[in-house]
Every structure is written in structure tokens, then in C-alpha cells.
Amino acid sequence: MKSKIITFVLAAIALTALPLFAQEFGHSWVRIMALALLYVLLALGLNIVVGYAGLLDLGYVAFYAVGAYMYALLASPHLFETFEWIAQLFPGGLHASFLIVVPLAAGLAAITGVLLGMPVLKLRGDYLAIVTLGFGEIIRVFLNNLEHPVNITNGPRGLDRIDAMHVGGFSLGKGIEIGGYEIPSVTLYYYMFLGLVVFSVVICHRLEVSRIGRAWMAIREDETAAKAMGINTRNMKLLAFAMGATFGGVSGTMFAAFQGFVSPESFSLMESIMIVAMVVLGGIGHLPGVILGAVLLAALPEVLRHVAGPLQHMTGGRLDAAILRQLLIASAMIGIMLLRPRGLWPSPEHGKAAPTATGN
């Protein structure tokens, strides 16, 4: 117990000091770390659906989009320019605070998750994956075309001029100065994302060891046996979709505030596949593994961006740097699955053989 406390304290100090050290090399590195934390939040949410309940969801990015567009519509002037009656109701604009938009995004995403879950309750495996994949694409196409006859999402042009996140009347879009040391906006976002990740890890851990978590895992292993044991598989599946969706909705809200711009292309099928890959490559159903997978796959493209340039130079410029980077990412993912088929950090219980009974 004492060693766990020491490890936790050291990790907290390291994660707190990391952006302060990284910003000396440029704010872009802090930005990469902040985005990596957002992907950790997304991976934790998908792990509830895929890792705990065993429901393969390839349309998880839809909940990410719901949260992002909800915040973008509330925090940008687009709605006020489109609907005059909204501008008259709120002449000063809607500048909702963190404590309002986060529960709102979580609730809206949860409702969307239940709406997705209800038609697919009897589907499993490949069929469920295909249906959820289609759902994710429907949301993206819907956002891409919802500019006629009334311009709500601004179509493929997206929504810009989105307000920074407000916490207690303070805008994270501006840096602060403490004791003569300036902490820029991107570092403040990093700390907010870190706090959300820590809170989410606690929630996921409590769910994992709770009766709900055990019910999800029973459904994952054998749904028929779970029904025989009296588990309401219908409600448990809907709860898994709703709980996982809340993480996606909150992540989308943070993404919109952080970027200041959203468009349908930010929520493509490739984004969904990357989130699934984070969960699977890290160690499906295992919180430390999921976090590791999310951090590595979120940071790897940016790190390889610096490697692809020299490699392009070595080939005499015959290969495009972007293609080289994608090739390196794909090679790394294939290598991980070949060397670690159960993930980089799999659950210790996974695949453990039951003890053999011995007679006297």
C-alpha cells in the first residue's frame, strides 16, 4: 500500500511538472500532450463498451462529434447570426461555464448512446460493428449537410470563433502569471484535461469492481449464462452505451474549446478506428493498458513527423514525408500486434489458467 502511494505521488509530480518543462521547447509539445490526454479520455470511454461489456463499437466518434458540436453551437456566434430571436433572448451571448457545458454534453451524449443501443441490443460481433460504423458515418454526413434549408452546422465549412472554456469566470484562452512565471493557455488546458482524466480513471475503476462492472464482464464472456444468472442484459448493454458515450461527449466539448474550430472532417471513420486501436493495442479491458495505448498512438504520429523528414532526405525526396509517416505508424502497429497480441499491457487476469485440483 505504501509503495502504491509513493508511486502515485511521484506520478502526480511528474505529470504536473511535465508541461512546464516541455513548454521550454515550444508550445507545440504541450499541445501534443494535451491532445494525448483527450484521446486517453476517449479510450477510457470506449473501453467501457468494448473492454468491459464486449460490444464492438466502430462508431464511437459520433458521441465525440455530438459533444463538440453542442459546445460549438453554444459558444460561437453562429446560432445568433442564424436565428435573430436567440440573439434577442441573449444579447450578451451564451458564455456557458465548465460546470454547465460538461454535464450538458455528458447528458446529451448519453441519450445519443441509448438511442444507438436500443436498435442493436440483439446484435453482437461483426453485425454490431457494421451497424455502429454506419451510425458514426450517418452523424458525420448529417453534420456535413445540415446547412439547408436552415443553416445549423454550417456544413463542411464547420464552426469557428468558438469561445475558450470558462472555469469559474476565468477563461482558459488566456495565460496566467504566477510569481513572475507565465503559464500559457495550452498548459492550462493540459491541466484541465489531466484533471478530467484522473476523475475518469477513478470512475472507471469503481465501475470495474462494482456489481455493474461484473455484470458487463459476465455479458462479455457469455450472454446466455449472464441471463441465466438473472442479469438484465438489455439494461446493462444500454447502460454501457450510455456510460461510454458520456466520455465521448465530454471529450468533444473539450476538443471544441481547445481547437476553437470544429468541422465534420474531424470526426471521420479513421478517427473511430484509431480510438479502437488505442484500446486494443494497449490492452483491452485493462485501464493502465488503455491509457498507455492512447498516449502512444496519440503522440506517435507527431513524433514520427520529425523522423519522416530525415528519411525523406535519405531517399532523395522520392517519397512524400506524409506517406512515410503513415507507413511508419502502420508498421509500428503491426509490430505491436505481432509481438504483443494481447496488447502492450494486458489485464493480468486475462488468459490466466484456473488452478488444477489435486487429490490427497
Name these PLM-found stretches.
Residues 1-360:
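Transmembrane alpha-helices and adjacent helix-loop boundaries
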